[in-house]
Amino acid sequence: MSELLKMEHLVKYYGNKTSLTKALNDISLTVEQGEFTAIMGASGSGKTTLLNCISTIDRPTGGKVWIDGVCTSELKKGELADFRRNRLGFIFQEFNLLDTLTAFDNIALALQIQKCPHDKIKEKIEAVAQKLGIREVLEKYPYQLSGG
């Protein structure tokens, strides 16, 4: 197995010298390809902060994060944007789909933004939908879909 995610001595502080909040303090973790990992803890324990640092939504104050061998902590702003667009996928609990578009069209829009060739979009969507077992919902609108 190979390392899919690696964190070394991850630190995230908020605030300033007079009012400093240590959200993450020296977190190290490795997740191998194929493993499932759960992040659990009490409210305010740093779960969301940790996920935001891993996903590059927020920069850690210290330490390093590697995703599939790429040290995201060292990427410049433009490189980080390219990495997010081309290598990461996000599924938020409160996703923002366009209500006037079907699930298929919402997915197609994301592929168009990524400059996917028009003639490949349908093929890509159908292949992924088949893998995920969601072909039957592609023509539904967001309000017709379950949040789960």
What are these regions (language model features)?
Residues S2-G148:
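ABC family nucleotide-binding domain
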